[in-house]
């Protein structure tokens, strides 16, 4: 089953949005496989966003991510990466579809509440980076109520 890395950023944590964000993924039928509430070290943030290191906003992004605790999660389910991106909404909140997390809770791109894997391959890399110890092994009893097979 496909997995995606989802991170509630410091602004989402500070604003008390953790429960609502988790609820949106659960209500869709995805399964939480790993979760950490943590402060991110500068070097770790730089590693996570290494693909953006040549962008002018990179230093500010790193400062933002290390400014407070984040909630790092792994969600599992059919097409969880693409569907998760639709639940999250466009990076620029003003372009996000109504009802998405960013449309509902974000105003500026630099405080857009949440990060989600943008591809299955990047999801695998992000999960390996954030959860090197592995994930909980379990299968929800709800699985047959969500998936046909």
UniProtKB/Swiss-Prot annotation:
Alphabetic keyword roster: ATP-binding, Kinase, Magnesium, Metal-binding, Nucleotide metabolism, Nucleotide-binding, Phosphoprotein, Transferase
Enzyme Commission numbers on file: 2.7.4.6
Active-site annotation: 115 (pros-phosphohistidine intermediate)
Amino acids binding ATP: 9, 57, 85, 91, 102, 112
Induction pattern: Up-regulated in the leaf sheaths of rice plants grown from seeds that were inoculated with the nonpathogenic P.fluorescens strain KH-1.
Catalytic activity: a 2'-deoxyribonucleoside 5'-diphosphate + ATP = a 2'-deoxyribonucleoside 5'-triphosphate + ADP; a ribonucleoside 5'-diphosphate + ATP = a ribonucleoside 5'-triphosphate + ADP
GO MF, one example: metal ion binding
Family to which this protein belongs: Belongs to the NDK family.
Function: Major role in the synthesis of nucleoside triphosphates other than ATP. The ATP gamma phosphate is transferred to the NDP beta phosphate via a ping-pong mechanism, using a phosphorylated active-site intermediate. This NDK is microtubule-associated.
Subunit-level organization: Homohexamer.
Protein name: Nucleoside diphosphate kinase 1
Upper taxonomic lineage: Eukaryota, Viridiplantae, Streptophyta, Embryophyta, Tracheophyta
Name of the gene this protein is made from: NDKR
């Amino acid at each position: 089953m496909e997995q995606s890395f989802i991170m509630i950023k410091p602004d989402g944590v500070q604003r008390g949005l953790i429960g609502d964000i988790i609820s949106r993924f659960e209500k869709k039928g995805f399964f939480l496989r790993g979760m950490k509430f943590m402060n991110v070290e500068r070097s770790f943030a730089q590693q996570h966003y290494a693909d953006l290191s040549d962008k002018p906003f990179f230093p500010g992004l790193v400062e933002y991510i290390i400014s407070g605790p984040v909630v790092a999660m792994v969600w599992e389910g059919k097409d969880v990466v693409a569907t998760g991106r639709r639940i999250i909404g466009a990076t620029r909140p003003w372009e996000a579809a109504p009802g998405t997390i960013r449309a509902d809770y974000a105003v500026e791109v630099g405080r857009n509440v949440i990060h989600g894997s943008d591809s299955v391959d990047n999801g695998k890399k992000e999960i390996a980076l954030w959860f090197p110890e592995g994930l909980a092994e379990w299968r929800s009893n709800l699985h047959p109520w969500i998936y046909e097979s």
